[in-house]
């Protein structure tokens, strides 16, 4: 049976759920797909289909990023169910980097937890400018307690530059909505309306040279190697030539799909799978970049403005100095780098500093690009590239 082609009839946005483990992100994602499926604009994806890796089912946590799609009256969304567990924040960094907006899920029973704050900080660092809050499990909570949690969340968002007073906060129950309770399915509608109206259509750089950071690599027997990810900028069509930076390969795109539907052309903001001609599976990996030929020159050295997380925000307890060698999470790549603080010499937790970084390998860099700094499984800093050195 031939696949139905993807037809672009509505503007496309990338949205995601984030928040602390067990606050109900995946349940809420399933509830959104169920409510919209009943409206006739999507396919219901049950909870156990979203949380799909075996180790997740055992531990009840989302590790790999799961994508679902749905439509509201005015938009088409690709929805990323974001990891909630601290060990997996590195996935969050690569997942959040391609989001146009996010739904912050906070349990009305528990309030703000450590990962709630870390996810908000990361969202800010990787350029997610608009957040809508879902106060989940609102069916089980005391109203006054829920009011306090809402206040707490607004203060957290304000502290991270999100204008907490104007952020929509919607009280929901993912579980009750899945059970079909009309009060709570209406709350899901209200949440989606808030996303539709509060998260603006981003400026898409469709005319810039094509660039896609590789999130995943698959092999289709008899057809070749497939890379998946979100198009950062530009447009790509079947038959276009591309460079795979990191693999040092030039090739041709022989197939293009989004959510299993073939498409003629993908553009900035689309989540896509690209079939690459004659590229061995082991030549390409997550962190590589697929780009228009000759459009990007990878570099190792750059200068950046970096915020070193305070101890209270889960950062280091001691300062960093020149010679520090953490992991730099840049787009979907993670690379070790040497830090030179110049005359500053040391940076204490809570400081914002300028640093020069020498990476362990060449990475496509450009001014304005955001990144996270991690060590020992936690985020310790976040910054923006200011200049790239040859």
UniProtKB/Swiss-Prot annotation:
Q: What class of enzyme is it?
A: hydrolase
Stretches the record annotates as G4 = 136-139
- UniProt-annotated stretches for the region G2: 60-64
Where in the cell is the protein located?
A: Cytoplasm
Outline the segment boundaries, as ranges, of region: G5: 173-175
Extract the InterPro entries matched here. EF-Tu_GTP-bd, EF-Tu_GTPase, EFTu-like_2, G_TR_CS, P-loop_NTPase, Small_GTP-bd, T_Tr_GTP-bd_dom, Transl_B-barrel_sf
Residue ranges for the region (G3) are 81-84
Would you say which domain of life the source belongs to?
Answer: Bacteria
Give the main localization category: cytoplasm
Stretches for region G1: 19-26
Of the GO CC terms on this record, one is:
cytosol
The protein's assembly and partners: Monomer.
Question: What's this protein's family per the entry?
Answer: Belongs to the TRAFAC class translation factor GTPase superfamily. Classic translation factor GTPase family. EF-Tu/EF-1A subfamily.
Function (record text): GTP hydrolase that promotes the GTP-dependent binding of aminoacyl-tRNA to the A-site of ribosomes during protein biosynthesis.
Q: What is this protein called?
A: Elongation factor Tu 2
């Amino acid at each position: 049976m031939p696949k139905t082609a993807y037809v672009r009839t509505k503007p496309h946005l990338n949205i995601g759920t984030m928040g602390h483990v067990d606050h109900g992100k995946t349940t809420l994602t399933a509830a959104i797909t169920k409510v919209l499926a009943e409206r006739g604009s999507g396919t219901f994806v049950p909870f156990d289909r979203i949380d799909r890796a075996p180790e997740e089912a055992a531990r009840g946590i989302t590790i790999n990023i799961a994508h679902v799609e749905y439509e509201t009256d005015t938009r088409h969304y690709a929805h990323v169910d974001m990891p909630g567990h601290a060990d997996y924040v590195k996935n969050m960094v690569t997942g959040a980097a391609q989001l146009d907006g996010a739904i912050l899920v906070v349990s009305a029973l528990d309030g703000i937890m450590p990962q709630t704050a870390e996810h908000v900080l990361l969202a800010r660092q990787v350029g997610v400018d608009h957040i809508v809050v879902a106060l989940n499990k609102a069916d089980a909570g005391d109203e006054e307690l829920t009011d306090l949690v809402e206040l707490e969340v607004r203060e957290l968002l304000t502290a991270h530059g999100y204008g907490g007073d104007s952020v929509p906060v919607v009280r929901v129950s993912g579980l009750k909505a899945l059970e079909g309770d009309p009060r709570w399915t209406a709350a899901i509608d209200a949440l989606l309306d808030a996303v539709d109206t509060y998260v603006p259509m981003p400026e898409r750089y469709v005319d810039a040279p094509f660039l896609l950071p590789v999130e995943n690599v698959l092999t289709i027997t008899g057809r070749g190697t497939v890379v998946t990810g979100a198009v950062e900028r530009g447009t790509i069509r079947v038959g276009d030539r591309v460079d795979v930076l990191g693999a040092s390969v030039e090739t041709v795109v022989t197939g293009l799909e989004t959510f299993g539907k073939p498409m003629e052309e993908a553009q900035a903001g689309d989540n896509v799978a690209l079939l690459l001609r004659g590229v061995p599976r082991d030549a390409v990996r997550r962190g590589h970049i697929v780009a228009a030929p000759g459009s990007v020159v990878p570099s190792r050295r750059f200068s950046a403005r970096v915020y070193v997380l305070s101890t209270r925000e889960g950062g280091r307890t001691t300062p960093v100095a020149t010679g520090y060698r953490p992991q730099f999470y840049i787009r979907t790549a993670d690379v070790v780098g040497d830090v030179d603080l110049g005359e500053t010499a040391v940076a204490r937790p809570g400081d914002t500093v300028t640093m020069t970084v020498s990476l362990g390998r060449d990475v496509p860099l450009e001014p304005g690009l955001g990144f996270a700094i991690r060590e020992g499984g936690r985020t310790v800093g976040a910054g923006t590239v200011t200049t790239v050195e040859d």
